[in-house]
Every structure is written in C-alpha cells, then in structure tokens.
Swiss-Prot record:
InterPro entries: DUF1283. Coiled coil: none annotated. This is UPF0482 protein plu2232. It comes from Photorhabdus laumondii subsp. laumondii (strain DSM 15139 / CIP 105565 / TT01) (Photorhabdus luminescens subsp. laumondii). Belongs to the UPF0482 family. Keywords: Signal. Pfam families: DUF1283.
Amino acid sequence: MNICNSLILKAMPAIALAIPLLWQTPALAATCTSGSTCVTVNGNGDSVLDKEAARQSKEQWNETKNLRTKVNKRAEKEFDKFDKAIDARDTCMKSTNINAYWEPNTERCLDSNTGMPIRP
C-alpha cells in the first residue's frame, strides 16, 4: 500500500503536465498551415446569410418607421383639426354678436338670422 501511494505521488506531477498537452493536441492539429486548404464554417459570423438577414431586418425597420411616421402625421393632423374646431367654438361662444351660434355638426359659427357663416 505504501509503494502504491508513493507511485501515485511521484506520477501526479507528470499527469498534471500531460493532461493540458493532451487537451491541446486536437487544436494544434486543426490549425491551417500555408500549404493546406482550410474551410472555416461560420468562423467570424460574416456569412452571406447573416448579411441577408441583416439587410432584411433593416428594410423591415425602415418600412415600419415610415408607417409610424405616417400614422403620427395623421394623428397630429387630426389633433390640429380638433384643436382648431375647439378654438373656433370658443371664439364663437365669446362673440359679442348676439346672432352668432355654434353649429356642432358642421363646426362653424353661423348667423342665427341668415344661417350664413360669420367671423366673430
């Protein structure tokens, strides 16, 4: 038993040095040399498929950005229209002209006698 333990203790440093070398053997064998042909599969992530996917993603982003811009412009236009109608209603209601009244369906300030639009 004592002999077995001494052999293990003597062999342990050699085994500790040999294991990393065995680990590196496949890596050293796989390196490309100047006279050999090397094929790298997805080596740096710059493949044609990746470029195409990036192009399609950018194209989709640009299309959705254009649609968002159109939607935002339309919403802003509707808001401005609504805001102008509120301002026009307020000025019509505050008008000193006693014949002026606000028509909610047409959103205009009308003369109650003639029905014609007026500027209060």
